[in-house]
Amino acid sequence: MFYLSTFMTIVISLSLVSCSYDCNNPGYSCKGTCHYYGPCICNEKLMGYDCSVLKSRMSTGSNCTVTCQNNGKCYDGSKCLCSSDYTGDLCEKQTTGARCTLDAVVFEAYRPIGFVGETYLSQSRSCKLLETTSDVPGMIKFERKIFHGDTSMCGLKKHMDIPSAGDVTYEADIYSTFQYNSWGTRDFMDNVKCQYKPTRVGLSMDAPDSLFPIKMSARDGASSNVQATTQSAPISLLFSPQNIPDVKGAMVDYLEVYSINSTSKEYKSVVAVKNGCAQKNEYNVAFSNLDELDPATSKWIGLVKMQAFIIFENEPILFNYRLRFCPDRCTTPTCAAPXVGQATSAAV
């Protein structure tokens, strides 16, 4: 029999930014004394980067019902006092940072009401972050999405990290000016990074699908969610994007099929798809890397057709994969003619 399990290979790290508060800048409040050099000086009763909270309001232990992130401190039992670099109910959002999606970097900046400046990538003022609907009360939100492959003046800087082979960093310098069309000593520059690591994070077929950006399933002619089948039977692996609003298509870029002998711990693997192209393999198994439209979600889902095969007797087959996410249907890579026969064209 042929058993299915899965392995996910993409992890998105946080971006790194610098401090971005100067009480002299328009829009920023200071309930203490605003120092010429930018910090807000609190008296003995106040705390916070802007001296906005009385020390007597701080909560600890069982008196606090929320978990504040990024060194935020709990007060009034259910609120978080953030540092100047973070905002949001739980201090979960960077004031200048990024969302690291699988095919792009979405730069984000939160500025106070009264902000009259601009935020843009260092390459050009035309690479501005544009105002969008804010999800933080009392803050204006600016945003700009740059795809990894963007070759315009607003394109990202890309680095292959050494010695961690496989790690890739995309970054940009962000200028924040507090007066329109100007630059001064109270303005800021932040270096924002997204690092993509091939670290493996496991999931099983019965794990809650809602936890992951991809739902992987398998089907044959009789079942739409098969977990066991016979050797040489046709089977299709489906990779459905979910929880990522700007992803409308997915296609397999890399697929490795592997198994581990539970007694000897020996590991064997087969690279089935590389750079989007089916690969020749020692088991003479044919693979086809495709996609198909899911009528239920109107999204293009990754589809790999193959035949079930055994690496180790009585051991499960597992999958290590990397997907390419696209804002619409992914373009099909140009591949050399496969060295083995094409997978069956019968619907499975």
From Swiss-Prot:
Where is the major localization of this protein? Answer: secreted
Q: Is Disulfide bond among this UniProt entry's keywords? A: yes
Species assigned in the record = Pinctada maxima
Q: Show where the EGF-like domain sits.
A: 60-92
Reading the lineage from the top rank, the first entry is Eukaryota
Per its record, how is this protein called by name? EGF-like domain-containing protein 1
Kindly list the cysteine pairs connected by disulfide bridges. 64-74, 68-80, 82-91
Q: Which UniProt keywords apply?
A: Disulfide bond, EGF-like domain, Secreted, Signal
Localization recorded for this chain is: Secreted
In the UniProt record, the signal sequence range is 1-19
According to its UniProt record, in which tissues is this protein expressed?
Answer: Prismatic layer of shell (at protein level). Expressed primarily in the mantle with highest level in the mantle edge and lower level in the mantle pallium.
InterPro entries assigned to the protein according to its UniProt record, in alphabetical order? EGF-like_dom, ZP_dom
Gene3D superfamilies per the UniProt record, alphabetical: Laminin
The ZP domain, residue ranges: 99-342
Instruction: Report which residue ranges the record marks as coiled coil.
Output: none
What cellular component GO annotations does this protein have? extracellular region
